């Protein structure tokens, strides 16, 4: 399944070089045997870094991404994550509608900021967003 997830992420021009070997905190949506959506999270203490959300064009506008975000947030909160962070170049409007707020990079907790996603995978032009999961 890891290879199929990587294929989907690459088809959407999302980074894969720094993915963990075991995708414990990744969720997939399937249609029969096909992966039609993926989302992942990296854990940094009480904070989560949402990453690698992708839905192929033929499956968009079917609430797949919304379901994946909602389930990931639910699981994160139930395991002690109090806030989610993300970087995006293309989906800030989408995540704003899901309750995420744009913040400055210097407002991100140090552990999250030192992740490979923040430190060298995503460009500095990417929007930084956060959502409090305890509200």
What is each PLM-predicted segment?
Residues 1, 46, 90-91:
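A generic "binding-loop/recognition-motif" signal
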Residues 1-18, 30, 126-128, 132-135:
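Short amphipathic alpha-helix that is part of the acyltransferase structural core
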Residues 28, 34-43, 47-54:
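Conserved beta-strand in the GNAT
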Residues 55, 61-74, 86:
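Conserved acetyl-CoA-binding loop-helix of GNAT-fold acetyltransferases
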Residues 74-90:
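Conserved GNAT acetyl-CoA-binding A-motif
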Residues 89-117:
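Conserved active-site alpha-helix within GNAT-family acetyltransferase domains
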Residues 108-135:
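C-terminal "cap" of GNAT-fold acetyltransferases
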């Amino acid at each position: 399944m890891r290879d199929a997830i990587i294929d989907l992420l690459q088809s959407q021009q999302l980074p894969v070089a720094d993915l963990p070997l075991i995708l414990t905190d990744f969720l997939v949506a399937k249609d029969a045997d096909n992966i039609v959506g993926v989302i992942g999270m990296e854990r940094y203490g009480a904070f989560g870094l949402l990453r690698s959300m992708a839905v192929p064009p033929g499956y968009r506008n079917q609430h797949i991404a919304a379901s994946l975000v909602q389930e990931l947030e639910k699981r994160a909160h139930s395991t002690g994550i109090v806030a989610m962070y993300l970087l995006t170049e293309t989906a800030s409007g989408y995540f704003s509608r899901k309750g995420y707020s744009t913040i400055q990079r210097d407002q991100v907790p140090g552990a999250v900021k030192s992740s490979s996603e923040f430190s060298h995978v995503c460009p500095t032009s990417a929007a930084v967003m956060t959502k409090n999961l305890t509200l």
